[in-house]
UniProtKB/Swiss-Prot annotation:
The lineage of its organism: Eukaryota, Metazoa, Chordata, Craniata, Vertebrata. It comes from Pongo abelii (Sumatran orangutan). This is ADP-ribosylation factor-like protein 15. Keywords: GTP-binding, Nucleotide-binding. SMART domains: ARF, SAR. It comes from the Eukaryota. GTP binds at residues 39-46, 82-86, 142-145. The keyword GTP-binding applies.
Length: 204
């Protein structure tokens, strides 16, 4: 090979390396999903979302109205609108449902019977609400680290989820602040459901 040809070859290789390193452009944007997060006061909604956002637990204050957090994951960003769970707030939840693409429902698995009954009623209402009934649901049985915590199977039976949510996209998972791997895995499953719903909408 002549010196000229060798020089051209080296220059072309340099060009390819330059393109690979410097000119490949920004990575594709992660999809964003708008979610609503509901549950009774004390269920742990704020603490779970703050932990996922790597916020200091010292700054966690129970939500009285609503707050919005952008929760980042490797393959998506979840814009979560958390609604306060007090008695006088829950009757206004439905005003904030519009535009939601998925639902996170947090319950205290170690709560009193009265609070568990109230949580069941609220979840039943959400699963049947016209603006939410077709959306993916992530149901988190929180506070599994407490001695009085009920198992997922007990929650599923008590909440009558099998007959009520038949045909819907839903996940019921145990969680606690002490097990972040399990919590992140639960949200990864929710993201999979959101992506599946997106793909179905495109095919239609």
């Amino acid at each position: 090979m002549s010196d000229l040809r060798m020089t051209e070859a080296f220059l072309y290789m340099d060009y390819l390396c330059f393109r690979a390193l410097c000119c490949k452009g920004p990575p594709p944007a992660r999809p964003e999903y708008d979610l609503v997060c509901i549950g009774l006061t004390g269920s742990g909604k704020t603490s779970l979302l703050s932990k996922l956002c790597s916020e200091s637990p010292d700054n966690v204050v129970s939500t009285t109205g609503f707050s919005i957090k952008a929760v980042p994951f490797q393959n998506a960003i979840l814009n979560v609108k958390e609604l306060g769970g007090a008695d006088n707030i829950r009757k206004y939840w439905s005003r904030y449902y519009q535009g939601s693409q998925g639902v996170i429902f947090v319950l205290d698995s170690a709560s009193s019977e009265d609070d568990l009954e109230a949580a069941r009623n609220e979840l039943h209402s959400a699963l049947q609400h016209p603006q939410l009934c077709t959306l993916p649901f992530l149901i988190l049985a929180n506070h599994q680290d407490k001695p009085a915590a009920r198992s997922v199977q007990e929650i599923k039976k008590y909440f009558e989820l099998e007959p009520l949510a038949r045909g819907k996209r839903w996940i019921l998972q145990p969680c606690s602040l002490d097990d972040m791997d399990a919590l992140k895995d639960s949200f990864s499953q929710l993201i999979n459901l959101l992506e599946e719903k997106d793909h179905e909408a495109i095919r239609m």
